[in-house]
């Protein structure tokens, strides 16, 4: 104990210990709580722009289910999954909006996304003020249990579930909740 006290009085040792503790805390925060990401493409314009830096809450979906409209950061290849959409590297992440929930049918008609209870029955049009035109018709596409249908807000410029199908919940990294850079765009959503 005496040796520890003497070492702590040394400013160099104190600095090293402080940096080590700070590094360990930052590592744990990124691993379990909040992780920063950079928006890789224009598929979420005008909500998120290319190069925006965002924070995603990693812990949130351990306590609650993803909700329609959430902006989610996820692995497009579902690291470890056998059904991998697209030909993406394991380190690649996508940022998209959750549109379709498990056991729903998703389609677009006349430029508007619709959620249906059956293949073409019980359909309702989503109110999507964030979506940029053009929106081509597609579907209906079934969202299996434990899966989510993801789309970019910039519908004419987005590689999303229309191209590679729904994602598994296990592919989710976290829900994006804040733009922290550039400073002029700091905002919560």
Please report, for each region that a protein language model flagged, where it lies by residue:
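Soluble "head" domains of membrane/secretory-pathway proteins
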Residues: 1-13, 17, 28, 32-38, ...
């Amino acid at each position: 104990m005496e040796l520890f006290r003497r070492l702590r009085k040394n400013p160099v040792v104190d600095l090293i210990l402080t940096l080590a503790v700070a590094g360990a805390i930052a590592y744990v925060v990124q691993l379990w709580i909040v992780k920063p990401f950079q928006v890789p493409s224009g598929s979420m314009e005008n909500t998120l722009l290319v190069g925006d830096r965002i924070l995603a809450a990693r812990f949130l979906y351990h306590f609650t289910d993803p909700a329609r409209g959430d902006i989610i950061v996820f692995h497009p290849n579902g690291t470890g999954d056998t059904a991998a959409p697209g030909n993406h590297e394991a380190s690649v992440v996508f940022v998209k909006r959750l549109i379709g929930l498990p056991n729903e049918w998703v389609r677009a008609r006349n430029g508007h996304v619709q959620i249906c209870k059956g293949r073409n029955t019980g359909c309702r049009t989503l109110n999507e003020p964030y979506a940029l035109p053009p929106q081509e018709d597609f579907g209906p596409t079934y969202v299996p249990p434990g899966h989510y249908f993801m789309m970019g807000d910039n519908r004419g410029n987005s590689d999303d579930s229309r191209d590679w199908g729904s994602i598994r919940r296990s592919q989710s990294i976290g829900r994006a909740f804040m733009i922290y850079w550039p400073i002029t765009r700091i905002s919560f959503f």
